[in-house]
């Protein structure tokens, strides 16, 4: 089954119910939310989530297991000086996810800043090991990054290192097509890309996909999302992810720009579903 949706707002007054309703209007069957603004760790109380309204009216079309939560950008669990704050926050975020029964948390792996890249990778392993020990159920999906600044998680070697060191069924991967392209993976040579995933034994660990076109050339390390078929990757390549049997039942999430101050996820979802290989 194809699971295709987008990022939608989780905001007052309807929070979870409002996000699910918006997704269903877009003809989506999965969705991604932030439990607060992406640039902050401020959160509202569980009681405001409108969970019962979601269960009564929307859970049939978008089950809780297909609600993806994205961690905020501003935490850095790979930085030794900021790891404690990041861990404490993520433990609470997973508790909030448990309340709504969401299964997958997408996490930017962080940046090495003034430290060495290997130090940051090892700190991330320590941070995630601690978080796993203090939480239950939720699977943390490490997102592939574009290589902007001092980001880690920018190639399959680093992602494989993290997966193997953590060695947990609660650690997985979120592929981001824009980030992969900007990091240097030529998705247009789709079979070679899949072969590279398999070479590193990562295909089976992919549990979420962010499907975005890119405003930049291959290997730009910029991370600037474009609308579907309006960037350098193109509809033909991006649709292959949607219709790939290896990615059946894996939530595929659009994070594309607004057009004229509004999202066009409904249009993009139909474009992708209609573009069969």
Swiss-Prot record:
Gene Ontology annotations of biological process type: base-excision repair
Domain of life, source organism: Bacteria
Gene3D superfamilies tied to this protein: Divalent-metal-dependent TIM barrel enzymes
InterPro entries linked to this entry: AP_endonuc_2, AP_endonuc_F2_Zn_BS, Xyl_isomerase-like_sf, Xyl_isomerase-like_TIM-brl
Cofactor(s) essential for the protein: Zn(2+)
Keyword Ribonucleoprotein attributed: no
EC class: hydrolase
Catalyses which reaction(s): Endonucleolytic cleavage to 5'-phosphooligonucleotide end-products
EC number: 3.1.21.2
UniProt xrefs under SUPFAM superfamilies: Xylose isomerase-like
Tagged with keyword Zinc: yes
PANTHER family from the UniProt entry: APURINIC-APYRIMIDINIC ENDONUCLEASE (PTHR21445:SF0), ENDONUCLEASE IV ENDODEOXYRIBONUCLEASE IV (PTHR21445)
Family: Belongs to the AP endonuclease 2 family.
Name recorded for this polypeptide: Probable endonuclease 4
Annotated source species: Mycoplasmopsis synoviae (strain 53) (Mycoplasma synoviae)
Record lineage: Bacteria, Bacillati, Mycoplasmatota, Mycoplasmoidales, Metamycoplasmataceae
């Amino acid at each position: 089954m194809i699971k295709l949706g987008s990022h939608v707002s989780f905001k007052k007054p309807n929070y979870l119910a409002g996000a699910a309703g918006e997704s269903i209007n877009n003809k989506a069957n999965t969705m991604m939310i932030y439990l607060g603004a992406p640039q902050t760790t401020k959160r509202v109380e569980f009681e405001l989530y409108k969970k019962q309204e979601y269960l009564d009216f929307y859970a049939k079309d978008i089950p809780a297991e297909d609600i993806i939560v994205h961690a905020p950008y501003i935490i850095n669990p790979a930085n030794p000086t900021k790891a404690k704050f990041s861990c404490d926050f993520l433990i609470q975020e997973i508790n909030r996810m448990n309340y709504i029964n969401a299964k997958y948390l997408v996490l930017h792996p962080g940046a090495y800043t003034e430290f060495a890249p290997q130090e940051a990778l090892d700190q991330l392993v320590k941070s995630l090991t601690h978080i796993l020990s203090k939480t239950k159920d939720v699977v943390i999906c490490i997102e592939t990054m574009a290589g902007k600044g001092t980001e880690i998680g920018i190639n399959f070697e680093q992602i494989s290192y993290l997966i193997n060191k953590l060695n947990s069924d609660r650690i997985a991967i979120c592929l981001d097509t824009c980030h992969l392209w900007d990091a240097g993976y030529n998705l247009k040579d789709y079979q070679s890309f899949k072969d590279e995933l398999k070479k590193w034994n990562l295909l089976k660990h992919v549990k979420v996909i962010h499907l975005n076109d890119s405003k930049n050339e291959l290997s730009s390390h910029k991370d600037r999302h474009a609308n579907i078929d309006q960037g350098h990757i193109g509809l033909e390549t991006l649709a292959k992810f949607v219709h790939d049997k290896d990615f059946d039942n894996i939530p595929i999430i659009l994070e594309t720009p607004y057009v004229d101050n509004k999202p066009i996820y409904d249009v993009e979802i139909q474009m992708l579903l209609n573009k069969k290989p």
